[in-house]
Protein backbone atom coordinates (compact mmCIF):
# COMPACT_ATOMS: atom_id res chain seq x y z
CA UNK A 1 0.00 0.00 0.00
CA UNK A 2 1.25 3.45 -0.87
CA UNK A 3 1.18 5.41 2.37
CA UNK A 4 1.32 9.16 2.82
CA UNK A 5 1.39 11.00 6.13
CA UNK A 6 0.71 14.72 6.43
CA UNK A 7 0.40 16.96 9.44
CA UNK A 8 -1.88 19.99 9.51
CA UNK A 9 -0.72 22.72 11.89
CA UNK A 10 -3.74 24.61 13.16
CA UNK A 11 -3.88 27.78 15.24
CA UNK A 12 -6.85 29.96 16.23
CA UNK A 13 -6.40 33.21 18.14
CA UNK A 14 -7.86 33.22 21.64
CA UNK A 15 -8.51 29.49 21.83
CA UNK A 16 -6.64 26.30 22.43
CA UNK A 17 -8.50 23.61 20.51
CA UNK A 18 -8.18 19.98 21.43
CA UNK A 19 -6.51 18.28 18.50
CA UNK A 20 -7.08 14.65 17.80
CA UNK A 21 -5.39 12.30 15.38
CA UNK A 22 -7.69 11.14 12.59
CA UNK A 23 -6.30 8.12 10.78
CA UNK A 24 -7.71 7.10 7.41
CA UNK A 25 -6.56 3.57 6.85
CA UNK A 26 -8.92 2.22 4.20
CA UNK A 27 -11.19 3.43 1.38
CA UNK A 28 -14.23 2.43 3.42
CA UNK A 29 -13.19 4.67 6.30
CA UNK A 30 -12.74 7.65 4.03
CA UNK A 31 -16.02 7.01 2.23
CA UNK A 32 -17.80 6.77 5.57
CA UNK A 33 -16.15 9.73 7.31
CA UNK A 34 -15.00 12.18 4.65
CA UNK A 35 -17.74 14.79 5.25
CA UNK A 36 -16.41 15.30 8.80
CA UNK A 37 -12.73 15.89 8.06
CA UNK A 38 -12.56 19.67 7.99
CA UNK A 39 -9.74 21.92 9.13
CA UNK A 40 -10.76 25.36 10.36
CA UNK A 41 -8.03 27.94 9.75
CA UNK A 42 -7.71 31.70 10.00
CA UNK A 43 -5.41 32.73 7.15
CA UNK A 44 -3.07 35.46 8.30
CA UNK A 45 0.69 35.79 8.35
CA UNK A 46 3.31 38.56 8.16
CA UNK A 47 3.76 40.11 4.74
CA UNK A 48 7.27 38.69 4.51
CA UNK A 49 6.01 35.16 4.95
CA UNK A 50 5.65 32.87 1.92
CA UNK A 51 2.18 32.14 3.28
CA UNK A 52 1.08 35.75 2.81
CA UNK A 53 -2.08 35.84 0.66
CA UNK A 54 -2.64 34.92 -2.03
CA UNK A 55 -0.90 31.70 -1.04
CA UNK A 56 1.04 30.01 -3.80
CA UNK A 57 2.44 26.61 -4.45
CA UNK A 58 6.09 25.71 -4.06
CA UNK A 59 5.70 22.04 -4.91
CA UNK A 60 5.67 21.77 -8.73
CA UNK A 61 6.23 18.01 -8.57
CA UNK A 62 2.74 17.43 -7.22
CA UNK A 63 -0.26 17.32 -9.55
CA UNK A 64 -1.95 20.60 -10.27
CA UNK A 65 0.76 22.69 -8.62
CA UNK A 66 2.68 25.64 -9.99
CA UNK A 67 3.34 29.27 -9.28
CA UNK A 68 -0.30 30.30 -9.57
CA UNK A 69 -3.33 30.51 -7.25
CA UNK A 70 -5.63 27.51 -7.06
CA UNK A 71 -8.88 26.59 -5.37
CA UNK A 72 -7.89 22.99 -4.68
CA UNK A 73 -4.84 20.79 -4.61
CA UNK A 74 -4.01 17.10 -4.72
CA UNK A 75 -1.52 15.21 -2.59
CA UNK A 76 -1.07 11.52 -3.28
CA UNK A 77 -4.55 10.05 -3.39
CA UNK A 78 -6.24 12.92 -1.58
CA UNK A 79 -7.93 16.00 -2.97
CA UNK A 80 -8.47 19.12 -0.87
CA UNK A 81 -11.22 21.52 -1.89
CA UNK A 82 -11.38 25.06 -0.54
CA UNK A 83 -14.56 26.60 0.82
CA UNK A 84 -14.68 30.05 2.39
CA UNK A 85 -16.97 31.75 4.89
CA UNK A 86 -16.81 35.41 5.84
CA UNK A 87 -17.60 35.84 9.53
CA UNK A 88 -18.28 38.54 12.08
CA UNK A 89 -19.56 38.58 15.64
CA UNK A 90 -23.15 38.04 14.49
CA UNK A 91 -22.44 35.14 12.15
CA UNK A 92 -22.60 31.43 12.83
CA UNK A 93 -18.88 31.13 13.42
CA UNK A 94 -18.60 34.40 15.33
CA UNK A 95 -21.11 33.00 17.80
CA UNK A 96 -19.30 29.68 17.75
CA UNK A 97 -15.99 31.24 18.82
CA UNK A 98 -17.64 33.77 21.13
CA UNK A 99 -16.19 36.76 19.29
CA UNK A 100 -14.90 37.83 15.92
CA UNK A 101 -11.38 36.39 15.68
CA UNK A 102 -8.58 38.92 15.62
CA UNK A 103 -5.55 38.75 13.33
CA UNK A 104 -2.99 36.14 14.29
CA UNK A 105 -0.03 34.44 12.72
CA UNK A 106 -2.01 31.29 12.12
CA UNK A 107 -1.25 29.32 9.02
CA UNK A 108 -1.40 25.79 7.77
CA UNK A 109 1.30 23.65 6.24
CA UNK A 110 1.52 20.04 5.15
CA UNK A 111 4.63 17.98 5.69
CA UNK A 112 5.79 14.94 3.81
CA UNK A 113 6.78 11.82 5.66
CA UNK A 114 10.42 12.90 5.38
CA UNK A 115 9.55 15.89 7.61
CA UNK A 116 10.71 18.25 4.85
CA UNK A 117 8.23 21.12 4.93
CA UNK A 118 6.35 21.66 1.67
CA UNK A 119 4.04 24.68 1.81
CA UNK A 120 1.07 24.08 -0.49
CA UNK A 121 -1.11 26.47 -2.39
CA UNK A 122 -4.40 26.71 -0.50
CA UNK A 123 -6.59 29.39 -2.02
CA UNK A 124 -7.64 30.98 -5.27
CA UNK A 125 -8.61 34.57 -4.69
CA UNK A 126 -7.44 38.09 -5.40
CA UNK A 127 -4.79 39.74 -3.25
CA UNK A 128 -7.19 42.58 -2.51
CA UNK A 129 -9.77 40.27 -0.97
CA UNK A 130 -7.18 38.74 1.35
CA UNK A 131 -5.08 41.79 2.21
CA UNK A 132 -7.63 42.93 4.77
CA UNK A 133 -8.42 40.62 7.66
CA UNK A 134 -11.58 42.52 8.72
CA UNK A 135 -13.83 40.61 8.68
CA UNK A 136 -11.68 37.49 8.77
CA UNK A 137 -12.32 34.40 6.72
CA UNK A 138 -12.68 30.81 7.83
CA UNK A 139 -11.40 28.07 5.55
CA UNK A 140 -12.63 24.49 5.38
CA UNK A 141 -10.53 21.82 3.79
CA UNK A 142 -12.40 18.67 2.86
CA UNK A 143 -10.63 15.44 1.99
CA UNK A 144 -11.96 13.72 -1.13
CA UNK A 145 -11.20 10.18 -2.15
CA UNK A 146 -9.46 9.89 -5.53
CA UNK A 147 -8.18 6.36 -5.93
CA UNK A 148 -6.91 3.28 -4.09
CA UNK A 149 -4.83 2.42 -2.16
CA UNK A 150 -4.06 5.13 0.32
CA UNK A 151 -3.52 6.00 3.96
CA UNK A 152 -3.35 9.43 5.53
CA UNK A 153 -3.10 10.97 8.97
CA UNK A 154 -4.27 14.43 10.03
CA UNK A 155 -4.02 16.56 13.13
CA UNK A 156 -7.29 18.47 13.10
CA UNK A 157 -9.73 20.27 15.33
CA UNK A 158 -12.50 18.00 16.49
CA UNK A 159 -15.81 19.17 14.99
CA UNK A 160 -18.94 18.79 17.06
CA UNK A 161 -22.19 17.61 15.43
CA UNK A 162 -23.61 21.15 15.80
CA UNK A 163 -20.64 22.67 13.98
CA UNK A 164 -20.80 20.03 11.28
CA UNK A 165 -24.50 20.71 10.74
CA UNK A 166 -23.81 24.45 10.46
CA UNK A 167 -21.16 23.88 7.83
CA UNK A 168 -23.28 21.40 5.87
CA UNK A 169 -26.19 23.82 5.55
CA UNK A 170 -24.05 26.72 4.34
CA UNK A 171 -24.79 28.31 0.97
CA UNK A 172 -21.16 29.19 0.31
CA UNK A 173 -20.31 28.15 -3.28
CA UNK A 174 -17.49 25.86 -4.36
CA UNK A 175 -15.05 27.16 -6.92
CA UNK A 176 -14.93 24.90 -9.97
CA UNK A 177 -18.33 23.28 -9.35
CA UNK A 178 -20.60 23.22 -12.39
CA UNK A 179 -23.56 23.43 -10.01
CA UNK A 180 -21.96 26.22 -7.90
CA UNK A 181 -22.34 23.94 -4.85
CA UNK A 182 -21.56 20.30 -4.10
CA UNK A 183 -24.74 18.51 -5.32
CA UNK A 184 -26.64 16.18 -3.04
CA UNK A 185 -26.05 12.57 -4.03
CA UNK A 186 -29.26 11.03 -2.70
CA UNK A 187 -31.91 13.44 -3.99
CA UNK A 188 -31.33 12.77 -7.73
CA UNK A 189 -31.79 9.04 -7.10
CA UNK A 190 -35.15 9.66 -5.43
CA UNK A 191 -36.43 11.94 -8.19
CA UNK A 192 -35.15 9.65 -10.94
CA UNK A 193 -37.07 6.71 -9.46
CA UNK A 194 -40.18 8.80 -8.73
CA UNK A 195 -40.38 10.26 -12.24
CA UNK A 196 -39.74 6.81 -13.73
CA UNK A 197 -42.70 5.45 -11.76
CA UNK A 198 -44.87 8.33 -12.95
CA UNK A 199 -43.76 7.68 -16.55
CA UNK A 200 -44.80 4.04 -16.30
CA UNK A 201 -48.16 4.98 -14.75
CA UNK A 202 -48.85 7.59 -17.43
CA UNK A 203 -48.00 5.11 -20.18
CA UNK A 204 -50.27 2.45 -18.69
CA UNK A 205 -53.13 4.94 -18.23
CA UNK A 206 -52.81 6.24 -21.79
CA UNK A 207 -53.02 2.64 -23.03
CA UNK A 208 -55.86 1.74 -20.65
CA UNK A 209 -58.05 4.71 -21.57
CA UNK A 210 -56.87 5.02 -25.18
CA UNK A 211 -55.79 8.56 -24.34
CA UNK A 212 -52.45 8.82 -26.14
CA UNK A 213 -53.75 11.58 -28.42
CA UNK A 214 -55.12 13.46 -25.43
CA UNK A 215 -52.28 13.44 -22.90
CA UNK A 216 -49.18 11.86 -24.46
CA UNK A 217 -47.04 14.86 -23.44
CA UNK A 218 -47.35 13.92 -19.75
CA UNK A 219 -45.47 10.59 -20.03
CA UNK A 220 -43.02 12.24 -22.44
CA UNK A 221 -42.21 15.00 -19.92
CA UNK A 222 -41.95 12.53 -17.05
CA UNK A 223 -39.44 10.53 -19.10
CA UNK A 224 -37.55 13.77 -19.84
CA UNK A 225 -37.32 14.53 -16.12
CA UNK A 226 -36.20 10.96 -15.43
CA UNK A 227 -33.30 11.40 -17.82
CA UNK A 228 -32.47 14.84 -16.41
CA UNK A 229 -32.21 13.66 -12.80
CA UNK A 230 -30.37 10.48 -13.77
CA UNK A 231 -27.73 12.68 -15.39
CA UNK A 232 -27.75 14.91 -12.31
CA UNK A 233 -26.86 11.88 -10.20
CA UNK A 234 -23.82 11.38 -12.41
CA UNK A 235 -23.03 15.06 -11.95
CA UNK A 236 -23.22 14.70 -8.17
CA UNK A 237 -20.00 12.67 -8.38
CA UNK A 238 -18.46 14.62 -11.26
CA UNK A 239 -19.29 18.26 -10.58
CA UNK A 240 -15.78 19.77 -10.48
CA UNK A 241 -14.73 21.09 -13.88
CA UNK A 242 -11.17 22.11 -14.68
CA UNK A 243 -11.63 22.79 -18.40
CA UNK A 244 -10.05 19.56 -19.64
CA UNK A 245 -12.67 16.79 -19.36
CA UNK A 246 -15.57 17.16 -21.82
CA UNK A 247 -17.95 14.51 -20.46
CA UNK A 248 -18.92 16.21 -17.14
CA UNK A 249 -19.68 19.51 -18.90
CA UNK A 250 -21.62 17.89 -21.77
CA UNK A 251 -23.75 15.75 -19.43
CA UNK A 252 -24.31 18.73 -17.11
CA UNK A 253 -25.64 20.81 -20.02
CA UNK A 254 -27.87 17.92 -21.17
CA UNK A 255 -29.22 17.47 -17.64
CA UNK A 256 -30.03 21.18 -17.34
CA UNK A 257 -31.77 21.20 -20.73
CA UNK A 258 -33.96 18.21 -19.79
CA UNK A 259 -34.96 19.79 -16.47
CA UNK A 260 -35.57 23.26 -17.93
CA UNK A 261 -37.57 22.20 -21.00
CA UNK A 262 -39.96 19.96 -19.07
CA UNK A 263 -42.19 22.65 -17.46
CA UNK A 264 -42.96 24.56 -20.70
CA UNK A 265 -43.92 21.26 -22.33
CA UNK A 266 -46.16 20.48 -19.36
CA UNK A 267 -47.83 23.84 -19.95
CA UNK A 268 -48.37 22.85 -23.58
CA UNK A 269 -49.94 19.58 -22.38
CA UNK A 270 -52.34 21.58 -20.19
CA UNK A 271 -53.28 23.85 -23.10
CA UNK A 272 -53.98 20.80 -25.25
CA UNK A 273 -56.26 19.37 -22.56
CA UNK A 274 -58.03 22.74 -22.21
CA UNK A 275 -58.65 22.68 -25.96
CA UNK A 276 -60.19 19.22 -25.63
CA UNK A 277 -62.46 20.49 -22.82
CA UNK A 278 -63.56 23.34 -25.12
CA UNK A 279 -64.35 20.71 -27.78
CA UNK A 280 -66.44 18.81 -25.22
CA UNK A 281 -68.57 21.86 -24.33
CA UNK A 282 -68.19 23.98 -27.50
CA UNK A 283 -71.11 26.33 -26.82
CA UNK A 284 -69.31 27.63 -23.68
CA UNK A 285 -65.87 28.00 -25.29
CA UNK A 286 -64.53 31.60 -25.45
CA UNK A 287 -63.35 31.00 -29.02
CA UNK A 288 -63.04 28.22 -31.60
CA UNK A 289 -61.77 25.12 -29.73
CA UNK A 290 -59.79 24.01 -32.76
CA UNK A 291 -57.49 27.02 -32.45
CA UNK A 292 -56.56 26.62 -28.76
CA UNK A 293 -53.49 24.44 -29.34
CA UNK A 294 -52.30 26.64 -32.20
CA UNK A 295 -52.77 29.84 -30.16
CA UNK A 296 -51.09 28.69 -26.96
CA UNK A 297 -48.69 26.47 -28.86
CA UNK A 298 -47.38 29.39 -30.87
CA UNK A 299 -46.61 31.28 -27.65
CA UNK A 300 -44.99 28.22 -26.07
CA UNK A 301 -42.86 27.70 -29.18
CA UNK A 302 -41.27 31.07 -28.44
CA UNK A 303 -40.82 30.12 -24.77
CA UNK A 304 -39.21 26.79 -25.67
CA UNK A 305 -36.86 28.41 -28.15
CA UNK A 306 -35.77 31.08 -25.66
CA UNK A 307 -35.40 28.55 -22.82
CA UNK A 308 -33.37 26.07 -24.86
CA UNK A 309 -31.06 28.77 -26.16
CA UNK A 310 -30.68 30.39 -22.75
CA UNK A 311 -29.85 27.16 -20.92
CA UNK A 312 -27.30 26.05 -23.51
CA UNK A 313 -25.53 29.42 -23.27
CA UNK A 314 -25.53 29.84 -19.48
CA UNK A 315 -24.69 26.21 -18.63
CA UNK A 316 -21.56 26.19 -20.80
CA UNK A 317 -18.64 26.86 -18.46
CA UNK A 318 -16.39 27.58 -21.46
CA UNK A 319 -18.61 30.35 -22.84
CA UNK A 320 -17.54 33.99 -22.78
CA UNK A 321 -18.98 36.38 -20.23
CA UNK A 322 -21.03 38.21 -22.87
CA UNK A 323 -22.45 34.89 -24.09
CA UNK A 324 -23.50 33.89 -20.58
CA UNK A 325 -25.18 37.25 -20.04
CA UNK A 326 -27.08 36.80 -23.29
CA UNK A 327 -28.27 33.37 -22.13
CA UNK A 328 -29.22 34.83 -18.75
CA UNK A 329 -31.36 37.50 -20.42
CA UNK A 330 -32.98 34.97 -22.76
CA UNK A 331 -34.05 32.89 -19.76
CA UNK A 332 -35.49 35.95 -18.04
CA UNK A 333 -37.56 36.82 -21.13
CA UNK A 334 -38.72 33.20 -21.51
CA UNK A 335 -39.84 33.00 -17.87
CA UNK A 336 -41.63 36.36 -18.04
CA UNK A 337 -43.45 35.30 -21.22
CA UNK A 338 -44.33 31.97 -19.61
CA UNK A 339 -45.97 33.78 -16.69
CA UNK A 340 -47.95 35.98 -19.10
CA UNK A 341 -49.21 32.92 -20.99
CA UNK A 342 -50.32 31.38 -17.69
CA UNK A 343 -52.40 34.48 -16.93
CA UNK A 344 -54.05 34.23 -20.37
CA UNK A 345 -54.80 30.56 -19.70
CA UNK A 346 -56.37 31.34 -16.32
CA UNK A 347 -58.51 34.11 -17.82
CA UNK A 348 -59.88 31.87 -20.59
CA UNK A 349 -60.42 28.94 -18.21
CA UNK A 350 -62.34 31.05 -15.69
CA UNK A 351 -64.41 32.62 -18.49
CA UNK A 352 -65.24 29.15 -19.83
CA UNK A 353 -66.06 27.90 -16.32
CA UNK A 354 -68.47 30.79 -15.71
CA UNK A 355 -70.20 30.16 -19.05
CA UNK A 356 -70.68 26.51 -18.11
CA UNK A 357 -72.30 27.54 -14.82
CA UNK A 358 -74.45 30.15 -16.53
CA UNK A 359 -75.57 27.65 -19.17
CA UNK A 360 -76.44 25.17 -16.39
CA UNK A 361 -74.45 22.39 -17.99
CA UNK A 362 -76.02 19.15 -16.64
CA UNK A 363 -74.71 16.59 -14.18
CA UNK A 364 -72.49 14.94 -16.76
CA UNK A 365 -70.35 18.09 -16.64
CA UNK A 366 -68.61 16.56 -13.62
CA UNK A 367 -65.97 15.53 -16.14
CA UNK A 368 -65.52 19.19 -17.09
CA UNK A 369 -65.34 20.38 -13.48
CA UNK A 370 -62.87 17.68 -12.46
CA UNK A 371 -60.60 18.36 -15.42
CA UNK A 372 -60.72 22.13 -14.92
CA UNK A 373 -59.84 21.84 -11.22
CA UNK A 374 -56.89 19.62 -12.10
CA UNK A 375 -55.80 22.15 -14.71
CA UNK A 376 -56.00 24.95 -12.14
CA UNK A 377 -53.84 23.02 -9.65
CA UNK A 378 -51.34 22.04 -12.33
CA UNK A 379 -50.98 25.59 -13.60
CA UNK A 380 -50.60 26.87 -10.02
CA UNK A 381 -47.64 24.51 -9.52
CA UNK A 382 -46.06 25.60 -12.79
CA UNK A 383 -46.67 29.26 -11.92
CA UNK A 384 -44.90 28.91 -8.55
CA UNK A 385 -41.99 27.27 -10.32
CA UNK A 386 -41.82 30.12 -12.84
CA UNK A 387 -41.82 32.73 -10.06
CA UNK A 388 -38.99 30.83 -8.34
CA UNK A 389 -36.94 30.83 -11.52
CA UNK A 390 -37.65 34.52 -12.08
CA UNK A 391 -36.49 35.38 -8.56
CA UNK A 392 -33.42 33.20 -9.02
CA UNK A 393 -32.47 34.95 -12.25
CA UNK A 394 -33.46 38.49 -11.32
CA UNK A 395 -31.59 38.51 -7.99
CA UNK A 396 -28.30 37.28 -9.41
CA UNK A 397 -26.08 40.28 -10.10
CA UNK A 398 -23.82 38.38 -12.44
CA UNK A 399 -23.66 35.35 -14.67
CA UNK A 400 -22.09 32.20 -13.29
CA UNK A 401 -18.28 32.15 -13.37
CA UNK A 402 -17.23 28.96 -11.61
CA UNK A 403 -13.56 30.01 -11.54
CA UNK A 404 -14.09 33.08 -9.34
CA UNK A 405 -15.17 32.92 -5.71
CA UNK A 406 -15.82 36.65 -5.79
CA UNK A 407 -18.26 36.26 -8.71
CA UNK A 408 -19.89 33.20 -7.17
CA UNK A 409 -20.54 35.05 -3.91
CA UNK A 410 -22.45 37.70 -5.89
CA UNK A 411 -24.92 35.09 -7.08
CA UNK A 412 -28.33 34.95 -5.47
CA UNK A 413 -28.53 32.79 -2.31
CA UNK A 414 -31.39 31.05 -4.09
CA UNK A 415 -28.94 29.91 -6.77
CA UNK A 416 -26.20 28.98 -4.30
CA UNK A 417 -28.39 26.75 -2.14
CA UNK A 418 -29.54 23.45 -3.65
CA UNK A 419 -32.46 23.15 -1.22
CA UNK A 420 -34.39 25.84 -3.10
CA UNK A 421 -33.99 23.92 -6.36
CA UNK A 422 -35.45 20.73 -4.93
CA UNK A 423 -38.24 22.57 -3.09
CA UNK A 424 -39.47 24.80 -5.93
CA UNK A 425 -38.36 22.97 -9.07
CA UNK A 426 -38.03 19.22 -8.63
CA UNK A 427 -40.74 18.70 -5.98
CA UNK A 428 -43.34 20.88 -7.71
CA UNK A 429 -42.87 19.17 -11.06
CA UNK A 430 -43.04 15.75 -9.41
CA UNK A 431 -46.29 16.69 -7.65
CA UNK A 432 -47.65 17.92 -10.99
CA UNK A 433 -46.77 14.65 -12.68
CA UNK A 434 -48.45 12.52 -10.00
CA UNK A 435 -51.42 14.92 -9.95
CA UNK A 436 -52.24 13.89 -13.52
CA UNK A 437 -51.73 10.23 -12.55
CA UNK A 438 -54.37 10.59 -9.84
CA UNK A 439 -56.73 12.84 -11.85
CA UNK A 440 -56.18 11.37 -15.29
CA UNK A 441 -58.58 12.90 -17.84
CA UNK A 442 -58.92 9.63 -19.76
CA UNK A 443 -61.94 8.31 -17.80
CA UNK A 444 -63.71 11.69 -17.96
CA UNK A 445 -63.15 13.14 -21.42
CA UNK A 446 -63.97 11.31 -24.66
CA UNK A 447 -61.03 10.15 -26.69
CA UNK A 448 -61.76 12.27 -29.75
CA UNK A 449 -63.13 15.67 -30.66
CA UNK A 450 -66.19 14.25 -32.44
CA UNK A 451 -67.91 13.80 -29.07
CA UNK A 452 -69.41 16.78 -27.29
CA UNK A 453 -71.79 17.35 -24.41
CA UNK A 454 -75.21 18.49 -25.54
CA UNK A 455 -77.18 20.94 -23.42
CA UNK A 456 -79.64 18.23 -22.37
CA UNK A 457 -76.83 16.13 -20.86
CA UNK A 458 -76.29 13.61 -23.65
CA UNK A 459 -72.95 12.98 -25.33
CA UNK A 460 -73.32 13.50 -29.06
CA UNK A 461 -71.04 12.60 -31.93
CA UNK A 462 -70.93 15.50 -34.32
CA UNK A 463 -68.92 16.24 -37.43
CA UNK A 464 -65.65 16.74 -35.50
CA UNK A 465 -62.56 18.42 -36.80
CA UNK A 466 -61.00 15.52 -38.64
CA UNK A 467 -58.05 15.31 -36.29
CA UNK A 468 -59.00 11.85 -35.05
CA UNK A 469 -58.74 10.49 -38.58
CA UNK A 470 -55.01 11.25 -38.63
CA UNK A 471 -52.45 8.67 -37.47
CA UNK A 472 -51.32 8.92 -33.83
CA UNK A 473 -47.78 9.99 -34.72
CA UNK A 474 -49.12 12.75 -36.97
CA UNK A 475 -51.30 14.06 -34.15
CA UNK A 476 -48.31 13.99 -31.79
CA UNK A 477 -46.21 15.86 -34.32
CA UNK A 478 -48.94 18.48 -34.67
CA UNK A 479 -49.03 19.00 -30.90
CA UNK A 480 -45.24 19.05 -30.63
CA UNK A 481 -45.13 21.63 -33.43
CA UNK A 482 -47.51 23.69 -31.27
CA UNK A 483 -50.56 23.08 -33.46
CA UNK A 484 -49.07 24.79 -36.49
CA UNK A 485 -49.15 21.78 -38.85
CA UNK A 486 -52.97 21.68 -38.94
CA UNK A 487 -55.37 24.44 -38.05
CA UNK A 488 -58.79 23.12 -37.18
CA UNK A 489 -60.95 26.07 -38.18
CA UNK A 490 -64.26 24.29 -38.62
CA UNK A 491 -67.34 25.63 -36.95
CA UNK A 492 -67.96 23.75 -33.72
CA UNK A 493 -71.32 25.27 -32.80
CA UNK A 494 -73.32 22.04 -32.66
CA UNK A 495 -77.08 21.99 -32.66
CA UNK A 496 -79.05 19.74 -30.39
CA UNK A 497 -80.04 16.53 -32.26
CA UNK A 498 -83.48 15.08 -31.73
CA UNK A 499 -82.82 11.37 -32.26
CA UNK A 500 -79.73 9.47 -31.15
CA UNK A 501 -78.61 5.89 -30.81
CA UNK A 502 -76.10 4.52 -28.35
CA UNK A 503 -72.68 3.17 -29.32
CA UNK A 504 -70.13 2.15 -26.64
CA UNK A 505 -66.70 3.76 -26.90
CA UNK A 506 -63.40 2.11 -26.05
CA UNK A 507 -62.66 4.31 -23.05
CA UNK A 508 -65.95 3.62 -21.30
CA UNK A 509 -67.89 6.63 -22.64
CA UNK A 510 -71.16 6.21 -24.53
CA UNK A 511 -71.26 7.74 -27.97
CA UNK A 512 -74.57 8.91 -29.38
CA UNK A 513 -74.62 9.03 -33.16
CA UNK A 514 -77.24 10.93 -35.12
CA UNK A 515 -79.94 8.49 -36.12
CA UNK A 516 -81.95 8.31 -39.34
CA UNK A 517 -85.27 8.93 -37.74
CA UNK A 518 -85.30 6.03 -35.32
CA UNK A 519 -84.39 5.84 -31.60
CA UNK A 520 -81.97 3.23 -30.32
CA UNK A 521 -83.52 0.33 -28.51
Curated annotation (Swiss-Prot):
Induction: Expression is positively regulated by the phomenoic acid biosynthesis cluster-specific transcription regulator C6TF. It holds the Pfam family RTA1. Residues 493-521 are annotated as: Disordered. It is a multi-pass membrane protein. It is found in: Membrane. InterPro entries: RTA1. The chain crosses the membrane at residues 186-206, 211-231, 249-269, 292-312, 332-352, 371-391, 418-438. GO terms for cellular component: membrane. Keywords: Membrane, Transmembrane, Transmembrane helix. It comes from the Eukaryota. Lipid-translocating exporter-like protein; part of the gene cluster that mediates the biosynthesis of phomenoic acid, a long chain aliphatic carboxylic acid that does not appear to be essential for pathogenicity but may play a role in allowing to outcompete other fungi in the environmental niche via its antifungal properties. Belongs to the lipid-translocating exporter (LTE) (TC 9.A.26.1) family. This is Lipid-translocating exporter-like protein RTA1. The gene is RTA1.
Amino acid sequence: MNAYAYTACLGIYGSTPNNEQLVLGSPDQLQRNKPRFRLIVLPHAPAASPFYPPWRSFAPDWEGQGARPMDHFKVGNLRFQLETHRIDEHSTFGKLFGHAPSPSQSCVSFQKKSDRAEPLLLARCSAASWSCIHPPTVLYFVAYQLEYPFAARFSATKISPIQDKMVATSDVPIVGSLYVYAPNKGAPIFFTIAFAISTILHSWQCHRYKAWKLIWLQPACAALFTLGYALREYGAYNYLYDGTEKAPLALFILSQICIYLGPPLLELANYHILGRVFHYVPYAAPFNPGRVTAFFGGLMAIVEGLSGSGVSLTANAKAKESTKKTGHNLLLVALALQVCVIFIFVYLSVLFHRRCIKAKVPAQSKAVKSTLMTLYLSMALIFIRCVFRLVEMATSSTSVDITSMERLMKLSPVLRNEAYFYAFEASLMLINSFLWNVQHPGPHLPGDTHIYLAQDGTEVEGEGDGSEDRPLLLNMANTLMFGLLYRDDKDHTHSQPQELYENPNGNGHKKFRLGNGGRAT
